[in-house]
């Protein structure tokens, strides 16, 4: 089975939507997907942050994007990832250093989508072995 690794370095809504959409395509193609939450990605998955007012890379487009998602029944990215984890092989790993930077050093500091906390060497190793590597 082929595999994809995604390095999610941003916690912006755009990057979260792109990550969930690309993951959906990979699951549809029967690929294993490993998502590594790097700095901003780790922040977006903190329990006290997730799902609430994710920032946009282009704030002037935030309202239009929200309306477009609602009007086209595009699910919230974390809801989409939850469904994809149920449908395919999707694992979400948090970089330990990123978690510590945001004051979240333990697994219980993150939403239940996060499978584990790992070192950056694991991310690099998985990138070496993956068929497809994406960074958002």
Features from the language model and the residues they span:
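Histidine-anchored nucleotide/phosphate-binding helix
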Residues: 17-30
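Short internal beta-strands
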Residues: 33-39, 93-95
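Ligand-binding beta-strand-loop-alpha-helix segment within the catalytic cores
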Residues: 72, 82-86, 90-107, 111-114
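A glycine-rich helix N-cap at a beta->alpha junction
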Residues: 53-88
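Short, hinge-like loop/turn segments at secondary-structure boundaries
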Residues: 51-56, 110-113
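N-terminal beta-loop-helix "entrance" segment that forms/cooperates
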Residues: 41-54
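Glycine-rich, aromatic-bearing surface loops/beta-hairpins
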Residues: 99, 117-136
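Short, glycine-rich nucleotide/cofactor-binding loops
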Residues: 5-16
């Amino acid at each position: 089975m082929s595999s994809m690794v995604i390095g999610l370095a941003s916690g912006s809504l755009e990057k979260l939507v792109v990550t969930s959409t690309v993951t959906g395509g990979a699951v549809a193609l029967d690929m294993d997907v490993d998502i590594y939450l790097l700095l901003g990605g780790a922040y977006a998955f903190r329990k006290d942050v997730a799902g609430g007012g994710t920032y946009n890379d282009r704030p002037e487009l935030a309202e239009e994007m929200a309306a477009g998602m609602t009007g086209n029944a595009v699910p919230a990215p974390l809801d989409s990832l939850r469904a994809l984890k149920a449908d395919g092989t999707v694992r979400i790993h948090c970089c330990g250093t990123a978690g510590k930077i945001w004051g979240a050093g333990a697994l219980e500091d993150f939403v239940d989508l996060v499978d584990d906390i790992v070192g950056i060497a694991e991310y690099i190793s998985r990138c070496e072995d993956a068929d497809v590597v994406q960074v958002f």
